[in-house]
Amino acid sequence: MASTDDPAGQRPSRAEAIVAHAEQSISEDAIVAAARERAVDIGAGAVTPAVGALLSVLARLTEAKAVVEVGTGAGVSGLWLLSGMREDGVLTTIDVEPEHQRIAKQAFIEAGIGPSRTRLISGRAQEVLTRLADESYDLVFIDGDPADQPQFVVEGVRLLRPGGAIVVHRAALGGRAGDAAANDAEVSAVREAARLIAEDERLTPVLVPLGDGLLVAARD
């Protein structure tokens, strides 16, 4: 009898196998793993290991000194971002849940990250982003409510310095964003965010099939 790879008796598609291999190839240290466990405990989303590793690579490639993150969670993505940033880099991370930020702050302390390297802002990202300075950030990571992605993208692009990059997580919505039959409000918002990026001549975008889809765009 031929072996199968899931309880339903169906082998994963080639694309699924590649993504699974990408995820399994990343090992997380004990501090990130502990933060991931806390994220589960408090019901906060957390990027997958491969998404985290890509964030670290992008931070390194952009030589990021100033990074903005929408959606602190338990600090998993923040730890990955900080691992790729310059040693004097500062992560500004925004979340509407103060408890999430308290837990993330503990993760940063456990990782030996000094308080001068993080700026945790509790509040609605829609409001906080508007108060940040134009063209002052090397990398913007958006991991907030997909329904708010268009506004986050508009503000995020405004914050980017030339040569910086914007990363939008949950750009695929489990495949619904590419399903012509799907047209609910969340899908429409994600498509609008993608359109805004695609039509901005300063940006060079690519959709990366990791996590729930990462829309990455570099600014000229």
From Swiss-Prot:
Protein name: Putative O-methyltransferase Mjls_4009
Annotated positions binding substrate: D143
Keyword S-adenosyl-L-methionine attributed: yes
Domain of life, per lineage: Bacteria
Top-level taxonomy: Bacteria, Bacillati, Actinomycetota, Actinomycetes, Mycobacteriales
Pfam families referenced in this protein's UniProt entry, alphabetically: Methyltransf_3
Keywords: Methyltransferase, S-adenosyl-L-methionine, Transferase
Protein family (similarity comment): Belongs to the class I-like SAM-binding methyltransferase superfamily. Cation-dependent O-methyltransferase family.
UniProt record, GO biological process: methylation
InterPro entries documented for this protein: Cation-dep_OMT, SAM-dependent_MTases_sf, SAM_O-MeTrfase
GO molecular function: O-methyltransferase activity; S-adenosylmethionine-dependent methyltransferase activity
PROSITE patterns: SAM_OMT_I
Enzyme class (EC, first level): transferase
Record-listed E.C. numbers: 2.1.1.-
Chain residues that bind S-adenosyl-L-methionine: V47, E69, G71, T72, S77, D95, V96, D145
Methyltransferase in keyword set: yes
